Amino acid sequence: MAVILSLIKRITTIIIALALFSSCGKNTKESNSNEQKLSTNTETENSKTKKKVLFVLTSHEDLGDTGMKTGFWIEEFAAPYYLLKDKGIEITLASPKGGQPPIDPKSASPDFQTPATVRFNDDKETQEVLSRTIRLETANQADFDAVFYPGGHGVVWDLAEDENSIALIEDFYNNNKPVAAVCHAPAIFKNTKNTDGTSLVNGKKVTGFTNGEEEAVQLTSVVPFLVEEMLKSNGGIYTKKADWSPYAVEDGLLITGQNPASSEPVAELL
């Protein structure tokens, strides 16, 4: 009889132990599941709150009838790109034709190298991203918090007249999102309008590549129009600093920079 009672006690002890072990395992699984859900929710929230900026680059590579090549100016892309990227901002690159946008050969010369361009030259990942810009016609302002246009002479030929670019800029502006442009890129405001039909820069403080700077690079008679003159004729309150000095202007949702040296100040304002 004593043996039977002892055996019953042992069996009971084993059953209780197994029940406790099963309960602990269940709680552990639930805890792990909850942790995974929390991690997923956190990642989702971070994705929602992460700022997104659209960069729009020129696809035009012919410098008028000179037989020389143009495109976008490396510093005007690289300096803002890395400044924003290093702050955790997500950047998407677009161009009218998509794919690899042309780089102005002069901007790659040793005389125009900066820390940002040197970083770009060694950055194979960003070079690969740049080679796969999306077509501008597929870009939607609803997917971004702001839009930025790097300069380069190419802009005055294509983006200044591009219907998709014009509509996109107006869409950003009308949805209270910043529009930034540097050097020749303020050419994008040539045909942009307010809802009342007036020029988007009318009555706004703006800057851009100066007449003097264009004369210095001997392209006054080559470009289809002068950025400074266009901004003034469209009613912009145009201001500038000494040629080649860094200078950026912010007026409401519009942010503009005078020249390549103004690239980083424009990005800081953005």
Where are these regions (language model features)?
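Conserved, well-structured core segments that form or line functional sites
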Residues: 176-180
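Bacterial N-terminal signal peptides that target proteins for export
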Residues: 1-12
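Extended, subdomain-level signal for the structured scaffold at the beginning of enzyme domains
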Residues: 25-175, 187-270
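Residue-level detector of intrinsically disordered, flexible termini
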Residues: 1, 16-18, 145
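Bacterial N-terminal signal peptides
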Residues: 11-21
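Catalytic nucleophile serine of serine hydrolases
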Residues: 183
